[in-house]
Amino acid sequence: MSATETRETRLSTINQSLKERGLKPLRKLGLAEMGEIEILGIQEIHDHSKRFFTDVKFAVKFPNGTEGAFTVRFNANGEVSDGAVLVVLVNGKFAIVKQWRLVLGQWTYEIPRGFGEKLDQARIKGALGTLKIADLPLGTLARELGEEVMRDAEITSVTHLGNIAENSGTHAVTPSYFLVQLEVDEKKLETRLKGSEDWLSVKLWDLKTARREIGRKLCDNHSITAVALATAYIESLPR
């Protein structure tokens, strides 16, 4: 068996183990002789939190020839989708979700995100225009705006903004970013938002406010990346 066949077999064996857990396959093993960290095999798989993620400890060879280990985090169900980050414009304003983040011990203001199987499948098939409200992982946003507002909401456009690595150092996670424009009944929206500053977990910001809050209220990498991608796209449109 040639060296190439051996490497192909090794990659196939590793990817089969990942596939059995619904994890995203490796694209390549890397080659130490070319200055890359080369994957030799799987040492351990830690799936104690597999509902959300799985950590895979790989045996590796470093460019200097020494061998060791490197742990990579994979998204749950990453074989199907690494999730979606949705820049949602409600009647032209950015929908921002306020929520408690246990790991930070604080409230944050974020762009909505969730599991995006239907979005990713539609993108691959070139069928984004066929999506319905129920196909979007709107989560808190939909709950907070309420059935009265969302019942007649209309998707006017869905644009794929790109796939951006979450943490290229340790995570094999590359979520999709989308710009979703929703039109809702303005009177119903005003009624829902009126006097809601203290209890409603959804804020609607104009473009100026969204830009101003980058690095301030918007302080997570998903949200900052999403707003940057969306504003670049919006500014590229013909006027």
Where does each model-flagged region fall?
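Acidic, metal-coordinating catalytic segment for phosphate/diphosphate chemistry
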Residues: Q43-V90, Q99
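A short, amphipathic edge element
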Residues: R27-D47
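Conserved Nudix-box catalytic region and its N-terminal flanking loop in Nudix hydrolases
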Residues: R73, G78-R143, A165, S196
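Active-site-adjacent beta-strand/loop module that shapes the phosphate/pyrophosphate-binding cleft
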Residues: A59-N64, N167-K188
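Nudix hydrolase/Nudix homology domain
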Residues: S2-K28, G35, L104-L119, R123, ...
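A short coil-to-beta-strand element that immediately follows conserved catalytic motifs
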Residues: D152-L161
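Short, well-ordered beta-strand micro-motif
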Residues: K57-A59, V88, L179-Q181, L204-D206
